[in-house]
Amino acid sequence: GIRYIVAGAYAIYEHTGIYRKTKDLDLLFEPASVVPAARALRDAGFVTRLEDAHWLAKATHGEYFVDLIYGMGNGIAVIDEGWISHSHPGILAGTPVRIAPAEELIWHRLFISERHRHDMSDIVHLILCLGDAIDWDRLVARVGQNWPLLLSQVLMFGYVYPGYRKNIPEWV
């Protein structure tokens, strides 16, 4: 089979218990798996298209929308083995799936900050709900030279949830 992990609103729900309606299903693939995944969806009756060559394909079938994500919108990284190896099991619509790891979800969401979309609430809720279960070493390594983005979210977390500062190690 084609390896994938579930991200988006469902992954946030799995990690935090916070439910929100979503218009689509976000599936993450290593780049080499996107074309086979798109073909499989096309064979299942979906219409598929390449949306952005460096990170995103889409599949639609009536009222069903699937994002096939294989990189970051800003082009700094692709979905790699780290996403898959640190994913964990879950159940979606009665089907066993792998859920994107919280650390990579935070890393990915650090770069989503536009006028019409900003994922800060997902980041602070992941920190609130998972706290010291987050592999902060891995997250900081993933963020790398973009550490000011993580710092801004750590500061915002402290502002929004001042009683939960212990959820973030002091060294961060």
Each language-model region and where it sits:
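Compositionally biased terminal segments of proteins
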Residues: 1-172
